[in-house]
């Protein structure tokens, strides 16, 4: 299910409730829950080869999680990430009680269901997909908010834009 999130760019509340009837012509057709309040906006996501392989593995029926199971889902994902060796130390800054504080954690501790969405946006951007197109799939309405999702470290940025120098 985590990989489906990475392949679709959807929120947990959406990728955890995908049903077989949401698939048409090798596309996922879904109305994200968050946008229902703002007017139903269907999102159509072409299925990647990886997405199709996962669907085939489960005969078109993906596991479903209720919103109440999000904490459990995140715990399982973190355990998997720890077990596969995502134990690098990462340092970042966080606003705590109005102060900017340097935080050090192990990489797996920061992985969650929301990592899927950030991964989707970052990978599509690195492949050269225009930001406006990615936003259509991810449901972002403001480029400012979308750009916060991109996780481009210095090395990835240099790799992506090397041709400009």
Identify the role of each PLM range.
Residues 1-3, 23-25, 35-37, 69, ...:
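Conserved catalytic core of the tyrosine transesterase superfamily
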Residues 1-13, 122-123:
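Short pre-functional
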Residues 5, 16, 135:
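The alpha-helix within a helix-turn-helix
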Residues 8, 17-54:
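Conserved tyrosine-mediated DNA breakage-rejoining catalytic core shared by Y-recombinases
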Residues 21-27, 110, 126-148:
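Short, polar N-cap/turn motifs at the start of nucleic acid-interacting alpha helices
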Residues 34-36, 138-163:
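Catalytic-site neighborhood detector that most strongly recognizes the C-terminal catalytic loop/helix
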Residues 50-99:
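Major-groove DNA-contacting interfaces characterized by cationic-aromatic clusters
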Residues 78-136:
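Short, basic (Lys/Arg/His-rich) helix/loop patches that form interaction surfaces
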């Amino acid at each position: 299910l985590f990989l489906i999130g990475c392949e679709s760019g959807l929120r947990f509340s959406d990728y955890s409730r995908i049903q077989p009837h949401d698939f048409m012509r090798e596309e996922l057709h879904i109305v994200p829950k968050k946008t229902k309040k703002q007017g139903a906006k269907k999102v159509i996501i072409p299925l990647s080869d990886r997405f199709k392989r996962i669907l085939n593995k489960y005969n078109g029926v993906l596991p479903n999680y209720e919103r109440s199971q999000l904490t459990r889902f995140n715990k399982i994902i973190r355990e998997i990430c720890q077990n596969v060796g995502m134990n690098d130390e990462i340092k970042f800054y966080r606003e705590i009680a109005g102060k900017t504080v340097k935080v050090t954690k192990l990489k797996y501790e920061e992985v969650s269901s929301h990592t899927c969405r950030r991964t989707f946006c970052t990978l599509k951007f690195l492949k050269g997909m225009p930001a406006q197109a990615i936003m259509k799939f991810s449901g972002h309405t403001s480029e400012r908010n979308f750009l916060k999702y991109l996780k481009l470290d210095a090395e990835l940025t240099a790799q992506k834009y090397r041709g400009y120098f």
